[in-house]
Amino acid sequence: MKTRLLFFVGLLVVATNSFSQNAKDNAVYNAPVVQEQKLNLTNEWDKTFPKSSKVRHKKITFHNRFGITLAADMYIPKNTTSTRNASGKLPAIAVSGPFGAVKEQASGLYAQTLAERGFLTIAFDPSFTGESGGIPRNVASPDLNTEDFSAAVDYLSTNELVDADRIGILGICGWGGLAINAAANDPRIKATVASTMYNMTRVNTNGYFDKGTAEQRYQMRVELSKQRTEDYRNGSYKRSVMNPKPAADAPQFMKDYYDYYKTKRGYHERSINSGQGWNLTSNLGFMNSQILQYAGEIKNAVFIVHGEKAHSRYMGEDAFKLLKGDNKQLYIVPGASHCDLYDKVNVIPFDKIEQFYRTYLVNK
């Protein structure tokens, strides 16, 4: 009898502790975990492309799981019925890139154009850049930037205008590789487009066209590690020089970068590529990890778009080889260079991109 009594007392203690722990867990869960930073957002139209009369535009903010508040432009189609579900909700697409650009450049153009075609879209500034929050400024990280895409999906999934089961993403240049990386990690992303993509971990590790050597990587690590010490000593971060005026014999793609980022065509004062520069030590993170490791496990749809004459074409084609399933597509744009797919609306295959999203976000 005494043994049985002790047994029931023990059960009561366990149950009480369990209830107490559940209450604590619920209290923690119900407490506010993130307080978004109040960002200083511009109100005027300061994009590198004209404003469309076919969409409504507004500024929004959201946060990632690291607590960083991101700034975005939302584009909402004014008159569309073909993409709405029975409840009137829209499919949505989050757009970012190129790597080192801001939402007022190519990503905004893509987002606005797709909104004209019936999709609710957002173009966002990555963590630590543009109008988004985060300190220090001008830092990139493969993990953090992959997370930025999923954070955009968090926001869209809870937006009253959006059908949470019909969300896609689109990454341009270095954000194309990050978009595929995000799709591998986040099954909520039902359709992914990578336009004129870079694999930033590959090019930082191996150099262009994989011509880098192990010794060169080691020497770069030595220099960047020294730079860390100097940055800490100085209390500031040394930045890279982005897209200086190229020499006459420079590769054509370097001339193309200069033409986009440093001239009226695509210059924006908040753009890292237009002049601010990355913190040099950002390279360390991209040299010590590789994205696309699980690209072959993506079950949802992926569409890779690249230019026939793009210096980066090999990165898109190699990424496509990693993908599996009949819902994966590769399209090579005849005659197009890497930067042609930033802003040349007569070259960017918007009809094909729209059809891809309609297939996997609208007609699913």
PLM regions and their residue ranges:
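Catalytic histidine-centered segment of alpha/beta-hydrolase-like enzymes
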Residues: 336-347
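Short beta-strand element of the alpha/beta-hydrolase
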Residues: 84-98
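Short beta-strand/loop motif that positions the catalytic acidic residue
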Residues: 298, 304-306
